[in-house]
Regions:
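Short acidic loop-to-helix transition motifs that present clustered carboxylates
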Residues: 28, 55-56, 151-158
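Residues that mark the start of a beta-strand
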Residues: 19, 115-116, 171-172
């Protein structure tokens, strides 16, 4: 989806021509770092838009920081850009931070009498930080966590996790 978005972006900004270079890292941190190095050293880009997942965004910090090249990550985890120090001074993200997302989710859940919740989340940095924040807010809102199942982003099926969660009959399931 992100690649398709590039076609919608303007070809000029303030009268200056803009050139977009699209490289696919396939959510692989090694490929992401290799692509970022190419963009910074060979293409001499002004900014990197992406990556789209937390692990690859975190990996790029070691490239963008020393190069002083801003990165606008499309991933969700707050750890990409916070605290604003070191290489993270060059990292920005568009998605809201986990506390804001959790607050809104639980506001809706408690308004709809949700008392129990289960999570099925990525087994990566974003999945961990997101479910950690969800548990904190859930406890404050008196919503009991009945399951926290994980899966790898490359998994082709989450059937075992779904079946386990559904067997516990939670009021809500967050994936």
């Amino acid at each position: 989806p992100e690649r398709n978005t590039i076609e919608l972006l303007p070809t000029s900004i303030a009268g200056r021509k803009v050139r977009f270079i699209v490289l696919d890292d396939a959510t692989d941190t090694t490929a992401a770092v290799r692509n970022a190095r190419k963009l910074v050293t060979e293409d001499r880009v002004d900014v990197i838009i992406g990556p789209t997942v937390t692990p690859t965004s975190l990996a790029l910090l070691e490239v963008i920081g020393p190069a002083e090249t801003p990165m606008i990550s499309l991933a969700g985890s707050s750890v990409i850009a916070h605290p604003v120090e070191g290489h993270k001074r060059w990292a920005f993200k568009l998605a809201p931070n986990e506390p804001l997302m959790a607050a809104r989710i639980f506001e809706h859940a408690t308004n709809n009498n949700v008392k129990t919740i289960a999570y099925i989340a990525f087994a990566n940095a974003f999945g961990e930080s997101f479910t950690s924040e969800m548990r904190k807010v859930g406890e404050l809102r008196k919503v009991q966590t009945v399951a926290h199942e994980k899966f790898n982003p490359t998994d082709t099926s989450v059937t075992p996790q779904v079946l386990k969660v559904l067997s516990l009959n939670p009021d809500a399931v967050l994936i």
